[in-house]
C-alpha cells in the first residue's frame, strides 16, 4: 500500500471555472455532497454535514492549509472517519492537495492525498481503500458539476 493517493482528470472547462467549483464553498458543497457552514480560508476549519445518502450522520471537518488562486488548494483532514464513537482528533491528519493546470482541452485537475503511513495501522488499509475510491468518484463529480462528464 502506498502512502498517497493520486488522481487526475482533464476537464473541458477553463481553469477559472474549475477553480470556482473547487474553492467556492457553495459549489464545493454541491459536487462533494457536503453542506459547509462557511467559506474556505487558510488556517480555518471548514466544517459541515455530509449530504451523501447513507452518510448524513457524519461531519466533514477539514482545515484549509493553503490557497493559491487558480493553481493550488490544500487542506488536512482525518480520512474515512465514519465511526461516531471514535475521536479521530488524536490521529495525524492526511494532506489533500489539488493542483490545476491549463490543458489542451481545458483544465488538468490533480488531487493527491498523502500521509496514510501515519494513520493507525488498525484502520490504515480501509481508510486508504475507501478514499482511493472516493477520490475517483469526486473527480467525476466535479467534472459533471462544471458541465463535462468524464
Listing of model-derived features with the role each one plays in the protein:
Residues 34-49, 53-57:
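A solvent-exposed, acidic/Ser-Thr-rich amphipathic alpha-helical stretch
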Amino acid at each position: 500500500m502506498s502512502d498517497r493517493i493520486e488522481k487526475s482528470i482533464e476537464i473541458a472547462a477553463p481553469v477559472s471555472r474549475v477553480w470556482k467549483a473547487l474553492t467556492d464553498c457553495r459549489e464545493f458543497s454541491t459536487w462533494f455532497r457536503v453542506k459547509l457552514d462557511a467559506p474556505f480560508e487558510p488556517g480555518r476549519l471548514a466544517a459541515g454535514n455530509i449530504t451523501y445518502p447513507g452518510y448524513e450522520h457524519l461531519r466533514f471537518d477539514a482545515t484549509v492549509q493553503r490557497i493559491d488562486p487558480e493553481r493550488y488548494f490544500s487542506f488536512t483532514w482525518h480520512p474515512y472517519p465514519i465511526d461516531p464513537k471514535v475521536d479521530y482528533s488524536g490521529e495525524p491528519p492526511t494532506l489533500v492537495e489539488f493542483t490545476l493546470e491549463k490543458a489542451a482541452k481545458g483544465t488538468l485537475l490533480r488531487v493527491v492525498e498523502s500521509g496514510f503511513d501515519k494513520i493507525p495501522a488498525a484502520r490504515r488499509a480501509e481508510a486508504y481503500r475507501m478514499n482511493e475510491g472516493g477520490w475517483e468518484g469526486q473527480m467525476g463529480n466535479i467534472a459533471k458539476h462544471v458541465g463535462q462528464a468524464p
